[in-house]
Design a protein with these regions (language model features):
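A solvent-exposed, acidic/Ser-Thr-rich amphipathic alpha-helical stretch
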Residues: 29-91
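Short, mixed-charge, low-aromatic patches
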Residues: 13-24, 50-53, 70-74, 126, ...
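A beta-strand edge to alpha-helix "cap/lid" segment located at domain peripheries
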Residues: 3-4, 8, 68-181
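Short acidic-aromatic low-complexity motifs
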Residues: 2-39, 70
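Charged, low-complexity, helix/coiled-coil-prone segments
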Residues: 1-13, 52-63
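Residue-level detector of alpha-helix boundaries and kinks
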Residues: 5, 17, 45-49, 102
Length: 181
């Protein structure tokens, strides 16, 4: 657990938020891997049947920040509020998922999304858990399919999933190598 002061954690958050903006602009989130410990875990629930869990910085870079972000190059995750708990070295950031559509307009996934982090003694992420409303995510992707705004990368991801391809990092509900909680 982090022993950082409130000021040090605020500086960490500022760096994290700027790195996210830089990655969104580049359409490549893999550089965020520099914020994670070698043995970090990063997971989230993907509806009533599956969890996603990446164990170790390589899986985090390649799966969570790589494969899972493919097709989202036209998306931004605007942090709306960040809460810092300096006693536990934990941070919660609440974000909106916003898509830039081909006609120049934007749309966003309804509901609350966010990331919950714990930093270790070296002030790198020990674990991260994301949360979002899967029903609203599915609805947005259906809307994007109907309007023709679903990116080619996301179309390929959906096709792989529909074809039954085993996606790396996906586990039956409650069977991930590290628990969500």
């Amino acid at each position: 657990m982090s022993k950082a002061s409130r000021e040090e954690l605020e500086t960490w958050v500022d760096r994290w938020l700027q790195a996210n903006k830089d990655c969104e602009k580049a359409g490549d989130w893999r550089p965020l891997a520099a914020f994670y410990a070698q043995d970090a875990t990063y997971g989230w629930n993907i509806g009533p049947k599956e969890d996603v869990m990446c164990v170790g910085v390589d899986e985090i870079r390649d799966i969570a920040l790589g494969l899972e972000m493919e097709g989202l190059e036209n998306w931004v995750y605007e942090y709306q509020k960040v809460l810092i708990d300096e006693k536990q070295g934990e941070i919660v950031g609440f974000w909106k998922q916003i898509v830039n559509k081909s006609d120049g307009t934007q749309d966003e996934i309804y509901g609350i999304g966010g990331s919950w982090f714990r930093l270790n003694a070296d002030n790198v992420i020990e674990w991260q858990r994301d949360f979002f409303d899967f029903g609203h995510v599915a609805k947005m992707f259906a809307t994007l399919i109907e309007s023709g705004d679903l990116s080619t990368g996301m179309q390929k991801r959906i096709e792989r999933s529909i074809a039954g391809e085993k996606l790396p990092g996906y586990y039956p509900l409650g069977q991930a190598p590290v628990p969500i909680w």
